[in-house]
C-alpha cells in the first residue's frame, strides 16, 4: 500500500500529523468523514443513533473539533460550522444564537455566553468520559470559579454582614 506521511512540528498551541492514503481517504469518506467538514457537514439523520441520548456525544465530538471555549468576565462557547449543521444544534438549545461568521456565506457560528454557555457545556460534558481534555479543563475551571463566586455572594447575602465575617469559611471556599 502506497502512503505518504508528513509530521509537522508541534508547538505550544497546535500539532499536526498528516497521512495521505487513497484507501484510507475513501474509507473515511464512506463513513461520512468528508474534507472541509466545516464547510460541508450536515447533521446526520437521527435514525443513525441507536439512542437519542447519544446525539449530545456526537455534538461534543464536533465541538471538540470546531468549537471554542473562552472566558473573561463571561464564559463564551462558540461552535463554527455550516448553517444546516448548526440549525440542528440550535434546535436543541436556544433560538437566536446563530450568526454568520464575519460575513461569510459558507460558515456560521453558534455562540452562547453567560448562563447559556454553562448550560450548553453541561449538556455536552455531564457524565461524559470521552472528550478533548484541553476544552474539558477550561469548562471545569470556569465552572469551579463560578461556583466559588456564587457561593461567596450567597454567604454574604445570608449572613447579613460583609463577606469577611467568617474568615475560616472563606479560606476553605478559596481552597476548593
Give residue spans per PLM region.
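Internal intein/HINT superfamily modules and their associated LAGLIDADG
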Residues: 1-176
Amino acid at each position: 500500500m502506497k502512503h505518504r506521511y508528513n509530521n509537522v512540528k508541534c508547538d505550544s498551541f497546535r500539532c499536526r500529523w498528516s497521512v495521505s492514503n487513497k484507501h484510507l481517504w475513501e474509507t473515511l469518506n464512506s463513513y461520512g468523514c468528508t474534507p472541509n467538514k466545516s464547510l460541508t457537514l450536515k447533521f446526520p439523520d437521527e435514525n443513525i443513533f441507536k439512542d437519542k441520548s447519544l446525539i449530545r456525544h456526537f455534538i461534543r465530538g464536533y465541538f471538540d473539533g470546531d468549537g471554542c471555549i473562552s472566558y473573561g468576565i463571561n464564559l463564551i462557547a462558540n461552535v463554527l460550522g455550516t448553517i444546516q449543521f448548526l440549525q440542528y444544534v440550535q434546535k436543541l438549545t436556544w433560538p437566536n444564537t446563530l450568526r454568520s461568521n464575519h460575513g461569510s456565506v459558507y460558515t456560521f457560528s453558534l455562540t452562547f455566553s453567560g448562563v447559556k454557555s454553562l448550560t450548553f457545556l453541561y449538556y455536552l460534558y455531564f457524565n461524559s468520559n470521552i472528550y478533548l481534555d484541553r476544552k474539558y479543563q477550561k469548562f471545569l475551571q470556569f465552572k469551579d470559579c463560578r461556583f466559588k463566586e456564587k457561593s461567596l455572594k450567597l454567604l454574604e447575602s445570608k449572613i447579613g454582614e460583609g463577606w469577611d465575617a467568617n474568615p475560616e469559611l472563606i479560606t476553605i471556599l478559596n481552597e476548593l
